[in-house]
Amino acid sequence: MKRQTIFCLFGLLVATVVFWANACHCSAVIIIGSAAGNTGTPLDAGLASRWNQVGDWGSYLGTPIAPNYFLTAKHIGGAVGQSITFPDDNSSYQTVATFQDPNSDLALWQISGAFPSSRIVPMYAGNVVAGVPLTIFGRGLPRTNTVVTGANWPNGTEAKGWLWGTAASARSWGTNTLDGLGDGGAAGTQLAYDFDAAGGSNEGILSIGDSGGPVFIYQSGAWGLAGINYAVGPLAVRQTIDGPTLTAALYDYGGLYLETGSPVSWQLVSATMANKPAVSYSTFLSPRSDWIEAVITVPEPATLLLLTAAFLATPLLHRRAQVSRCRRCLPRSFTQFTHSHDPRPSVAESKSMPALHRQ
């Protein structure tokens, strides 16, 4: 994981696709070491506990943070009346209301009844610094063993990453190291971490379907919930300007062509001595702790009924995957993609990302 002070990012894709029914069981969080991924329970005892505490929300994940609430990503949607389930004992809890954060991509869901205390995951408290280790859970697409190649520096060609696989549903995990924080605009402050070829066999990157999964940071002897998976990019590349468009997990997109401009064109990203890895983003929870606390500590029955009725009046999720388009090089920024029920991609304004510094 490179801990560079400044990134030049080329846009990103919201890590979302709806798999609410009949998804096959494949690997999820993509890792360097194997196309099979880490689909078994982590060996670390604390992470093994978190593995069982996190529930399946459709074909995504949800994390209980209070007796009556679990947290996930807002953009994946859902419907009141659906249930979160826990594979370790097949327990299930029906949702009765949802609360969506107006200032981030977070959504809290209220359940009927209560989670046992053993299900509730503690929140990470405080700030973060570049270099802190992360553990990521998700249920996204796997990678394949098919290598993407591009121009090497100063000459020749070299491997750049792997093509994505197809269907996914099984949860898996990976590790990474925080590079810094990104300004996601309406999506909130984002934990940013890249896909480093030298990061070790468990080095992880998000893929479509990992949205809503948790990110943990070790604090005071326990793994605290620090983030909720949001996005990753760049993804769509070409090996030649007229070649097929590929979707890949990239530890170096230098020497490949990225989509840019309107009308669409493909631009070669110069190969350099240093790799240019894709970056994953997870919504950082600490800046939204006041909103979270306000929701989970004020269960007003009248307000609950109004919120439930309002949500049921909106269209339900069941939308097709949105496919990102990399619009242009945005130094020290990233492109925020809108979330609509229209399956065609749409791009919102670019939001400034501050320089990322070690502390």
Each model region followed by its residue ranges:
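Cysteine-centered motifs
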Residues: C8, C24, C326-C329
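Bacterial N-terminal signal peptides
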Residues: F10-W20
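Sec/Tat signal peptide C-region and signal peptidase I cleavage site
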Residues: F19-S27
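C-terminal subregion of chymotrypsin/trypsin-like serine protease catalytic domains
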Residues: S27-V54, G58-G77, A168-W173, G204-T297
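Catalytic-histidine neighborhood of serine endopeptidases
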Residues: A66-P67, L71-S104, A114, V129, ...
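Chymotrypsin/trypsin-fold serine protease catalytic domain
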Residues: S112-I205, G209, N229-T247
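A short, hydrophobic C-terminal helix/tail in secreted or cell-surface proteins
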Residues: E300-H318
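C-terminal membrane-anchoring or membrane-association module
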Residues: P315-R332
